[in-house]
């Protein structure tokens, strides 16, 4: 594994995305559209500073952060909630905790070879996504 997550990453698989969205109380119609989409992630990393874009034909989401610095995040276009977000390194993986009205919410992201792995968690639901470097 490596801490270098720079690059453009195209989605290969998206396991249990609907279960994850249900745990976030995302409506039925939005879930049905979202599970059919393929996402592209663009990550610009300078040490512990990240600029990320998650793009699809339905919605885009930008997130800029510095590892180890808690910040207020509004999950616009996702579940539209305000959360306190902290992202840290655990080994070569980024681990995010999002504190708010949903319990056990966050994600873990790491790179192995030419693959980016992302596990999204909310409550007892885990979505596993795999992206390939473009």
From Swiss-Prot:
InterPro entries: Calycin (IPR012674), Fatty_acid-bd (IPR000463), ILBP (IPR031259), Lipocln_cytosolic_FA-bd_dom (IPR000566). All-trans-retinol binds at residues 41, 109. One of its GO terms (molecular function) is retinol binding. Keywords: Cytoplasm, Retinol-binding, Transport, Vitamin A. This is Retinol-binding protein 2. It comes from the Eukaryota. Forms a beta-barrel structure that accommodates hydrophobic ligands in its interior. Intracellular transport of retinol. Its main location: cytoplasm. One of its GO terms (biological process) is fatty acid transport. Belongs to the calycin superfamily. Fatty-acid binding protein (FABP) family. It holds the Pfam family Lipocalin. GO terms for cellular component: cytosol; nucleus. It is found in: Cytoplasm. It comes from Sus scrofa.
